[in-house]
Amino acid sequence: MKTQHNDEMQWIHHIPQYYDTFLIVKPGFLKRSHIILEAFCNAGYKVVKQTQKELSYIEAEDLYIMHRDKDFFAELCTYMASGFSRGYILKSPYIGENYTINETNKLKNYFRKCYAQDDMRNVLHTSDNFINLRREVEIYFLGEADVLCQEDKFKEGYIAKAMNVDKH
């Protein structure tokens, strides 16, 4: 960020703030989760918490509620409830919700190109906004969304408060 002081432009350096993002490695792809996670960590993401879970059909419906009226909804829910998936809460080194989502999507799309079997069995799901993130985290980490997704209003989006993270 630049500030004006005595007609000189000076740079102010800030401690990086981390935005919470949520990643799901979908059923059938858990054997690749270490490769996927390593790529995210190499890009500066930090693992806050992870879990492996077999979703019920109802939980899958809650996860993809935004697609409720689409033709593929029932098939997607059946697929997501077909086996274990792994959920990761990550801290992103990027400032701002939109920038974080764009950077996360780049990695997601790379892995989809490498490993996807079809449009539905496409390896990864990532949260596309803070509201969905909180709902999705609650599905995987029941009762912990308020603790894990602490929010502050910052410019165009929400950024999670910087916190100590453990790398798993």
Q: What residue ranges belong to the model's regions?
A:
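Non-catalytic terminal and connector segments of soluble metabolic enzymes
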Residues: 1-168
